[in-house]
């Protein structure tokens, strides 16, 4: 595995003080970060969010997706609990990259859904690689998690790499008129689990 730990620093945020841990992936030349709060290396299950980079949603406040709202909600939940980790993976556009994501958005403007747009560009519906998580979890000493997710692929990936998911916490937030069809496509074509009671 080519993912290596680089360095850590403090990261003050409106939700509280996090630690930011940097990792490099030589195989893709990408840099990933993990935000942690509290001691995540103890044996108690850790509240965890696996979040893929979304420039448009996280930084530009786009309403086409629910990514920005999900990131902020995850940070808020961890701050309330006082302990947790957010794995921020640099896999923009479900792994197709920012410029291809813009191309996919153009196709969606013309009527394609999010899966059809990826496929018309020659990509799979979800190109993300979750194998990069294993060395990050190992470095941080996290073995058991309470996973904030609606995505069954993330559950399968963590289980495959030996992470014990003791609880799945539904993570639904950010629905609006601009992303309602997008979320329904994620549910219908990608198997995302929406419409459940929040289990925290």
From Swiss-Prot:
InterPro entries assigned: GTP_cyclohydro_II, RibA, RibA-like_sf
Molecular functions per Gene Ontology: GTP binding; GTP cyclohydrolase II activity; zinc ion binding
Gene Ontology cellular component terms for the protein in this record: cytosol
Domain of life: Bacteria
Annotated keywords: GTP-binding, Hydrolase, Metal-binding, Nucleotide-binding, Riboflavin biosynthesis, Zinc
Residue positions of the active site: 126 (proton acceptor), 128 (nucleophile)
Pathway: Cofactor biosynthesis; riboflavin biosynthesis; 5-amino-6-(D-ribitylamino)uracil from GTP: step 1/4
Entries under Pfam families matching the protein: GTP_cyclohydro2 (PF00925)
Listed SUPFAM superfamilies: RibA-like
Cofactor(s), names only, from the UniProt record: Zn(2+)
EC number: 3.5.4.25
Binding residue positions for GTP: 49-53, 70, 92-94, 114, 149, 154
Catalytic activity: GTP + 4 H2O = 2,5-diamino-6-hydroxy-4-(5-phosphoribosylamino)-pyrimidine + formate + 2 phosphate + 3 H(+)
Keyword Flavoprotein: no
One Gene Ontology term from the biological process aspect of the record: riboflavin biosynthetic process
Cofactor note: Binds 1 zinc ion per subunit.
Binding-site residues, Zn(2+): 54, 65, 67
Record function comment: Catalyzes the conversion of GTP to 2,5-diamino-6-ribosylamino-4(3H)-pyrimidinone 5'-phosphate (DARP), formate and pyrophosphate.
PANTHER family xref list: 3,4-DIHYDROXY-2-BUTANONE 4-PHOSPHATE SYNTHASE, GTP CYCLOHYDROLASE II-RELATED
NCBIfam families hit by this protein: PRK00393.1, ribA
Family the entry assigns: Belongs to the GTP cyclohydrolase II family.
Name this protein carries in UniProt: GTP cyclohydrolase-2
High-level lineage: Bacteria, Pseudomonadati, Pseudomonadota, Gammaproteobacteria, Cellvibrionales
């Amino acid at each position: 595995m080519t993912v290596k730990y680089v360095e850590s620093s403090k990261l003050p945020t409106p939700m509280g003080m996090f630690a930011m841990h940097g990792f490099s992936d030589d195989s893709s030349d990408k840099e990933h970060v993990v935000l942690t709060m509290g001691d995540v290396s103890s044996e108690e299950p850790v509240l965890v969010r696996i979040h893929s980079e979304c420039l448009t949603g996280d930084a530009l406040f786009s309403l086409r997706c629910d990514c920005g709202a999900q990131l902020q909600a995850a940070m808020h939940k961890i701050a309330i609990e006082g302990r947790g980790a957010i794995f921020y993976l640099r896999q923009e556009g479900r792994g197709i990259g920012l410029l291809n994501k813009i191309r996919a958005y153009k196709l969606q403007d013309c009527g394609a859904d999010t899966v059809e747009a990826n496929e018309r560009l020659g990509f799979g519906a979800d190109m993300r690689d979750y194998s990069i998580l294993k060395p990050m979890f190992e470095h941080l000493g996290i073995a058991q998690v309470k996973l904030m997710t609606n995505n069954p692929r993330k559950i399968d990936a963590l289980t495959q790499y030996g992470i014990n998911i003791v609880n799945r916490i539904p993570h639904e937030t950010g629905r609006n008129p601009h992303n309602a069809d997008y979320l329904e496509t994620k549910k219908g074509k990608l198997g995302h689990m929406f419409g459940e009671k929040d289990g925290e």
